[in-house]
């Protein structure tokens, strides 16, 4: 997607992101429904099979953008980046490193939410599994759908004025979501929790919309795929710990406290993103344009 869009890159990626949100809403209900009828193992079998089919289709149908002959020849002459170079680029570029750390914080909170929120609604409000799966996914991803489209447009406009404002927007998005995380973890009124879901989804979209645009602004084009892989791998490796951590907190202090605790992660990450935008972004942005 980034190869096909330059000035509207953030908006293009935001449109792509909406497909993810639609899929989450549908799967949240479908997984609960399948689990309710045939047990939770069946849900894994169904979604695993769909994932395999989807992967095969993507592998067959996705093609790289065709470059002009001169550009293609120059690219072919270059040696392919080694695996370690992707790590080196991310971990020696301050902006990319900060983004990777904060992306990990984003995924940690989202994974914790996706794993435990259906259980929270099921246990605290007496919903059935299908209802808990649907309500925990619908409101937050509906508003994330709207938010990511608005954020994509805003990001492209801000980026044309001052590139560092994209990273600052990511930080403000995380900070704005903090009160809503606390709200959805502490309220005893269902509609108030839904408001928390909505605000959580809408505000986090301002981080997601700029994620790869910011990364590609500070990483040389030949390392884009490697750097993306490093960031995603790191983020989901750390995010995978969230279900375990929240499960331990649930046993010790209750799930409400565990969900509220997630706000601290985004509070710290939001502040770090603002510092990165202020002190590192333009240095890294200008550096690759002189190489």
Task: Identify the meaning behind each predicted range.
Residues 1-21:
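Cytoplasmic helix-loop-helix junction between adjacent transmembrane helices
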Residues 36-48, 165-168, 248-266:
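A membrane-interface helix-boundary motif in multi-pass transporters
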Residues 156-173:
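Cytoplasmic membrane-interface "Motif A"-like loop-to-helix N-cap segments
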């Amino acid at each position: 997607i980034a190869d096909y869009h330059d000035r509207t890159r953030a908006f293009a990626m935001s449109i792509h992101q909406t497909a993810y949100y639609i899929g989450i809403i549908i799967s949240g209900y479908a997984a609960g429904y399948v689990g309710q009828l045939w047990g939770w193992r069946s849900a894994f079998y169904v979604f695993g099979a769909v994932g395999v089919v989807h992967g095969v289709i993507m592998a067959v149908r996705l093609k790289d953008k065709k470059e002009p002959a001169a550009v293609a020849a120059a690219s072919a002459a270059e040696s392919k980046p080694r695996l370690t170079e992707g790590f080196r680029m991310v971990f020696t570029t301050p902006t990319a490193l900060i983004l990777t750390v904060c992306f990990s914080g984003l995924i940690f909170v989202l994974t914790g939410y996706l794993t435990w929120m259906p259980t929270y609604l099921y246990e605290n409000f007496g919903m059935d599994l299908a209802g808990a799966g649907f309500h925990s996914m619908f409101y937050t991803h509906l508003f994330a759908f709207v938010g990511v489209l608005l954020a994509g447009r805003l990001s492209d406009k801000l980026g044309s004025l001052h590139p560092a404002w994209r990273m600052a927007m990511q930080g403000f998005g995380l900070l704005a979501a903090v009160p809503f995380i606390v709200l959805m973890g502490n309220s005893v009124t269902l509609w108030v929790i839904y408001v928390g879901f909505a605000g959580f989804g809408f505000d986090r979209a301002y981080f997601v919309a700029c994620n790869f645009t910011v990364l590609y602004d500070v990483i040389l084009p030949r390392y884009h795929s490697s750097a993306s892989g490093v960031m995603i791998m790191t983020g989901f490796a750390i995010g995978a710990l969230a279900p375990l951590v929240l499960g331990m907190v649930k046993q010790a202090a209750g799930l409400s406290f565990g969900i509220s605790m997630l706000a601290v992660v985004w509070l710290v990450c939001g502040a770090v993103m603002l510092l990165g935008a202020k002190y590192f972004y333009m240095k890294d942005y200008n550096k690759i344009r002189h190489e």
